[in-house]
Curated annotation (Swiss-Prot):
Organism of origin: Akkermansia muciniphila (strain ATCC BAA-835 / DSM 22959 / JCM 33894 / BCRC 81048 / CCUG 64013 / CIP 107961 / Muc)
Name the UniProt record assigns to this protein: Phosphoglycerate kinase
Subunit structure: Monomer.
EC class of the enzyme, as a word: transferase
Pathway(s) served: Carbohydrate degradation; glycolysis; pyruvate from D-glyceraldehyde 3-phosphate: step 2/5
Stored Gene3D superfamilies: Phosphoglycerate kinase, N-terminal domain
Length: 403
């Protein structure tokens, strides 16, 4: 069922509670990356231009259900004020007399940022009384925090039970457009690049995407588990020993469906796991290649890079979720870097499914050449698994006039 978007709301002169994702990195009280604040600006500006009285709520970090100055949103209010070119009033509480007074004093076009919602135990518990207090006198609710849309918390799901109408912002709308819409009937060939550490973390998304994908390209430590399941010698590489049967089941399922499931033809090996370590590529596994005793496969090899890049070049749609190796260290970054560059050079619709893959795309400066980079981690994965996100499912249906 289609949900209301911010375009469907008449916000003029009305108090609107908006859940944003301002979970930005801080160092000594200074914001080191404001990308999440910038991502929320289109929806914020849209509502302010309409003349809404906008109340923003967010979490930051993982405080222990109580106030902690290290996780205060005060620096965010200052940065948001700079970006908007207007005063953003910061309130050092999310509910209670101070928050109520600040909200009561608002005029049309004003914006207030409440203190970290996770300073209150009622947030994660999705406590109805806390949700009701957080909504306050707002009649409209807008959720634009995709990164927490998979959490049924008071500020994402609970408040919708008390608002007249609840809608998604532009950021969530765009996430759904790509992670659901573009992948509903993807242009073929549809290639899925899957990496990361654990097969067990990706089993549901692998199963779901197998219904639509033509080819899987597998990298990261999870590739080691599949290679071990095929009987190859991986030395001291990281392997999920208790998931070998699961890996074999996935390989068999792909074969039965006629889906190509490509494992790395070779891997990049180091004898020490440290930055600056010397590395070398194994011979192709099909030609008797193996990881020597004590060696660790920490990236895909040169032949694998060549094969993966050729398949990406011919694709029409590519979904990338998970790095090919430990790209944070330059000596183990080649596989992820070259796959990212192949994706950037392709004419395919390129969708990066959040988390480490987006970090890698930024590191290798290809983000602007890709069709879409998700802002979610767990939320992206759950959406790709076909799950309904609580923060989206709770929004008002398009066919309804209210809730």
């Amino acid at each position: 069922m289609a949900k209301l978007t911010v375009r469907d709301l008449d916000a003029k002169g009305k108090e609107v509670l908006m859940r944003v994702d301002f979970n930005v990195p801080l160092k000594d009280g200074e914001i080191t990356n404001d990308a999440r604040i910038v991502a929320a600006l289109p929806t914020i500006k849209f509502l302010l231009d309409q003349g809404a009285r906008l109340v923003l709520t967010s979490h930051l970090g993982r405080p222990k259900n109580e106030p902690d100055p290290a996780f205060s949103l005060k620096p965010v209010a200052a940065r948001l004020s700079e970006l908007l070119g207007k005063d953003v009033k910061f309130v050092s509480a999310a509910i209670g007399p101070e928050a109520e007074a600040a909200r009561a004093a608002m005029k049309d076009g004003d914006v207030v940022l409440l203190e970290n919602v996770r300073f209150y135990p009622g947030e994660k518990k999705n406590d109805p009384e806390f949700a009701k207090s957080l909504l306050g006198n707002a009649t409209l609710f807008v959720n634009d925090a995709f990164g927490t849309a998979h959490r049924a918390h008071a500020s994402t799901e609970g408040v919708t039970h008390f608002a007249e109408k609840s809608a998604m912002g532009f950021l969530i709308e765009r996430e759904l457009e790509y992670l659901e819409g573009k992948l509903e009937n993807p242009e073929k060939p549809f290639v899925v690049i899957m990496g990361g550490a654990k097969v067990s973390d990706k089993i549901e998304v692998l199963s779901k995407l197998m219904e639509k994908a033509d080819t899987f390209l597998i990298g990261g430590a999870m590739a080691n588990t599949f290679l071990a399941a095929e009987g190859y010698d991986l030395g001291a590489s990281k392997i999920e020993g208790d998931k070998l049967d699961l890996a074999r089941e996935i390989l068999a399922a792909a074969k039965a469906k006629g889906v190509k499931f490509l494992l790395p033809a070779d891997v990049r090996v180091a004898m020490k796991f440290e930055d600056g370590a010397e590395t070398f590529c194994t011979a192709p596994f099909a030609e008797g290649g193996k990881v020597p005793e004590g060696g660790m496969a920490i990236d895909i090899g040169d032949k694998a890079i060549e094969e993966f890049s050729a398949i990406i070049k011919d694709a029409k749609t590519v979904l990338w979720n998970g790095p090919m190796g430990v790209f944070e260290m330059d000596c183990f970054a080649k596989g992820t870097k070259e796959v990212a560059e192949a994706l950037a050079d392709s004419t395919a619709i390129s969708i990066v499914g959040g988390g480490d893959s987006v970090t890698a795309a930024k590191k290798f400066k290809v983000q602007d050449k890709l069709s879409f980079c998700s802002t979610g981690g767990g939320a992206s994965l759950e959406l790709l698994e076909g799950k309904v996100l609580p923060g989206v499912g709770a929004l008002t249906d398009k066919c309804c006039c209210g809730k």
